[in-house]
Regions:
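"A position-specific structural signal for the A-helix of alpha-solenoid helical repeats
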Residues: 7, 46, 78, 114-125, ...
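Short alpha-helical DNA-recognition segment
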Residues: 16-33
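Short, charged recognition helix plus adjacent turn
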Residues: 63-90, 262
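Helix-turn-helix repeat elements of alpha-solenoid scaffolds
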Residues: 85-98, 128-137, 166-178, 207-218, ...
Length: 289
């Protein structure tokens, strides 16, 4: 993609940074010059280093370079929310069929993305709904053909997680963690990634898959929450309690789950407290037999 070098040079010159400074001492300025002139490419690692040296966020660069899709599908998401609030699931199914029909004639990625978004909501609402092999293949190819992820790709992954089986969710998480741009991705999108890892943890626990639950717990522990990320800490405390129950220590697990609910009540987070109290009641009936 020859234009990437041109976009990089635009940011570098706009900030009055020399070629030597822009390399960050990581590679030669002649290599950077060839990249800017479209004569060669830079590895992802060198590009991240150079972007840091010219004080440019990865997402700022990807938007300017046209790598990141500006189409955020806000109109579609708003339409879906309206249907959900009106409890018109039949119309949501019709919307999916409409999107499916469009993709039978169109190869545009944005059309397939919209089809997947609607399918994801259907899967979340109805266990009987499953993504087709073609939809799953498209999602994987679309996400992992992008060299540099930004908020768009992460949000798309987050929205589409209901179409994934636990094994696929785990596979995608491993691929995200192995990306060269993961450190930057995590720094710029902590909430989204915290939510993703926690959802994987909760999914594994709900399916009573201790091996996968232990994996997601390790991921969470390696990228643990700051003190100002209290909500994540409380939900994680609750989920840990259920995993303890699943491993046979019912009294200890239920006590920990109750502790999380009590914290929500102390903080006057009544909606969250009521939601997790209901989950605690269900767990009590399940594990106290």
């Amino acid at each position: 993609m020859e234009h990437l070098g041109q976009v990089f040079r635009f940011f570098r010159e706009a900030r009055h940074i020399s070629l030597s400074e822009a390399t960050g001492g990581e590679f030669s300025k002649s290599m950077l010059s060839r990249f800017e002139n479209g004569q060669s490419e830079l590895s992802a690692q060198k590009l991240f280093s150079a972007l840091s040296a010219i004080h440019t966020e990865t997402e700022e660069f990807t938007v300017a370079a046209g790598i990141q899709d500006h189409h955020s599908h806000k109109e579609l998401l708003s339409q879906i929310q309206d249907l959900l609030q009106a409890n018109q699931l039949d119309l949501l199914e019709e919307l999916y069929l409409e999107k499916e029909k469009i993709t039978q004639k169109s190869k545009r990625a944005s059309d397939w993305v919209e089809r997947l978004i609607v399918k994801a909501y259907l899967c979340a609402l109805k266990e009987s709904k499953k993504a087709s092999p073609g939809e799953l293949d498209f999602l994987h190819d679309y996400l992992f053909s992008v060299d540099i992820w930004g908020r768009y790709e992460l949000n798309l992954f987050s929205v589409c997680t209901p179409v994934l089986s636990l094994d696929l969710f785990s596979q995608y998480t491993k691929e995200i963690l192995s990306r060269k741009d993961f450190a930057t991705l995590f720094a710029n999108n902590r909430n989204t990634l915290h939510t993703t890892f926690l959802n994987g943890y909760l999914l594994a626990i709900s399916q009573e898959n201790i091996t996968q639950a232990d994996y997601f717990q390790q991921v969470i522990e390696r990228h643990f929450y700051e003190e100002n990320e209290t909500y994540f800490r409380i939900v994680y405390l609750f989920a840990q309690g259920e995993l303890i129950c699943l491993k046979g220590k019912t009294e200890e697990g239920l006590t920990q789950m109750k502790k999380a609910v009590d914290i929500f009540r102390i903080l006057n987070c009544q909606h969250s407290a009521d939601y997790y109290q209901e989950a605690l009641d269900t767990a009590f009936q399940k594990y106290s037999k």
